[in-house]
Amino acid sequence: MARTLGPITALLLGVAFLLAGTGLQFTLLPLRATEEGFSTLAIGLMGSSYFVGFVGGCLFSPYLILRAGHIRAFAAMVAVATAAVLCHAIAIEPSTWAALRVLTGFCLAGLYLVIESWLNDRASNDNRGLVMSAYIVVNYGAVTTGQMLVTLYPRAGFEPFALAAILLALAIVPVVLTRSAQPAPITFVRFRPLHLYRAAPVALVGSFMIGMANGAFWGVGVVFALGSGLDATLAATFASVVVAAGALAQWPIGRMSDQVDRRVLLAMLLGGSIAAGLALGLLPATPTSLLMLGFAFGTLALPGYSLVAAHAYDKMPAGEAVETAAGVLLAYGAGSILGPVLASLTMAGVGPGGLFLFTAAAQGLLLAFVVHRARVQPPLPASAKTGFDLAATAPMGAVITTEPLDVTDPLVAVPDTAPAPQPDADPAPRQQDEPTR
């Protein structure tokens, strides 16, 4: 294991810093916004703005990377994301924060693309599963840790924003100092929803509706916790418990889905998450009950994306893996744009519990659709399924695939930039007439 992970340790360390800073922002910004008197709708719009930027980054950041190269593009996007964090502390105004979240979402999508392209390039058929699984474990672990860092400093001060900026800035150090050669293949996004729907309707509709429900939690989950009587520390703990529960459940649920109809298992998870959501939204709240129900909700709701992504891989041709991954991720992102706004409107009407009443409604609609599809279309035999892959079905980026990227694929490109110099190697002399890239 050490021999396999050693060459990518720098990348994983960069991921840990990057995602810790991101997780801190997901909790810090709703907490500070509530203390500043932002309306629930304004906070929901902030959550949606992040996913607007994320979808935009999925679509357009590949062109930035092709133009500048992996390391320079990575450095530029980290710099912009770091500046955006600090600007939150300077300009405390809802529309400004929403615009800054768009910038952050765009940069994070591009950073995912760079990191995952390197990991894909460094992984071989023998160690791909270990490399990608390590990446996902670091990802979830860093986000959960970052959420709890909000308890270190008073939210009213500059310190938590400075800490988030420091973490983001540190992410660049192990990456720019890595001896890994670039360039690595990157993927472009082609979104053909009708093509995906004809082959796997549950995958398209499921990723969109799950994006609505899960995006609502990411956007205003902390606001729900505060409105339910938790203090800032317990609100951060609540958010971390939900995410940690979802992370722990991903692999066992995914492996279970290899043995049964994924749609049936998804329906069972949806039924359980609806029950947990209704309990969170309607029952009297105590710290213990909220944490327990939050754990149940995370266990049942967050792995849903992995199931619909795996279902999409089952139904789509193997040669369209890149397009399939991008299509499911963009549908999830589109749902995540709507979710926080609609949930915040529900909360404004019925109170904090409206968040989970909204998630239950979205999941209920999806449950009805999944049951209908399971009745009209027979399940695939186990032998015809694509084995569940934790990394390829996580809602992180569209570039991770179960096989190495095919550079002849029209959706795959290699930046035309020189590789990073290797140790003890002299850089190639530049010709006088060579244009500066």
What are the language-model segments listed below?
Residues R72-C87, A165, V264-A279, L357-A360:
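Structural signature of the two symmetry-related core transmembrane helices
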Residues A2-F51, A203-G206, N214-F224, S228, ...:
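Helix-loop boundary and gating motifs at the non-cytosolic
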Residues V150-T151, L163-P185, L366-R375:
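C-terminal membrane-cytosol helix-exit motif in multi-pass small-molecule transporters
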Residues G69, I90-S95, D261, L283-A285:
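Helix-breaking motifs and short loop linkers at transmembrane-helix boundaries and internal kinks
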Residues R263-S306:
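C-terminal transmembrane helical hairpin of 12-TM major facilitator-type secondary transporters
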Residues L29, G110-A123, L302-P317:
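Intracellular juxtamembrane helix-capping segments at the cytosolic ends
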Residues G57-H70, P154, A249-D261, M347-A348:
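Helix-to-loop junctions at the C-terminal end of transmembrane segments
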Residues V102-V137:
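Cytoplasmic helix-loop-helix junction between adjacent transmembrane helices
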